[in-house]
């Protein structure tokens, strides 16, 4: 029952949603790794990070509801919200990887920054908040 409701709320489980889930989980894990490496691991900061990640999925669900109830068909808002957060999480993930000393392929940086720049028009404030890292 819960799975069915989540599927309806999120607009189904497609490749975009799976990609977002992967990016969110990996970004959170790399954020924890950075905090561990810096000796700043905090359950309070971690909980706040989890709350922010949950909010991402609530916003995807809200966008889906707006697509279905207001626009009527398609998934324009849902797709835009997912692209925004995939790019945001991807940029954050690369920052975390760089912070841990991992070299980042330039092409990957370019693609994520390009995607981030295109979706940045959705909300400049949200992208600044997410870039603070977890």
Language-model features: locations:
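Short, strongly hydrophobic alpha-helical membrane anchors
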Residues: 1-9
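Alpha-helical transmembrane segments of multipass membrane proteins
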Residues: 4-5, 32, 61, 65
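Hydrophobic core segments of alpha-helical transmembrane domains in multi-pass membrane proteins
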Residues: 15-26, 78-85
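A cytosolic-side transmembrane-helix exit/cap motif
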Residues: 36-45, 96-104
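Juxtamembrane helix-capping/reentrant segments at transmembrane boundaries
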Residues: 38-59
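Hydrophobic alpha-helical transmembrane segments in multi-pass integral membrane proteins
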Residues: 59-68, 123
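Hydrophobic alpha-helical transmembrane segments and immediately flanking/interface helices
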Residues: 69-99
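Membrane-proximal cytosolic segments adjacent to transmembrane helices
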Residues: 87-134
């Amino acid at each position: 029952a819960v799975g069915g409701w989540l599927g309806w709320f999120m607009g189904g489980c497609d490749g975009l949603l799976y990609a977002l889930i992967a990016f969110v989980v990996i970004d959170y894990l790399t954020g924890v790794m950075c905090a561990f490496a810096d000796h700043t691991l905090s359950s309070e900061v971690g909980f706040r990070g989890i709350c922010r990640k949950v909010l991402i999925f609530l916003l995807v669900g809200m966008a889906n509801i707006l697509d279905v109830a207001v626009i009527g068909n398609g998934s324009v808002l849902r797709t835009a919200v997912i692209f925004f957060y995939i790019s945001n999480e991807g940029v954050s993930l690369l920052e975390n990887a760089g912070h841990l000393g991992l070299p980042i392929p330039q092409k990957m940086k370019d693609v994520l920054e390009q995607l981030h720049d295109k979706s940045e028009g959705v909300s400049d404030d949200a992208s600044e908040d997410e870039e603070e890292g977890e």
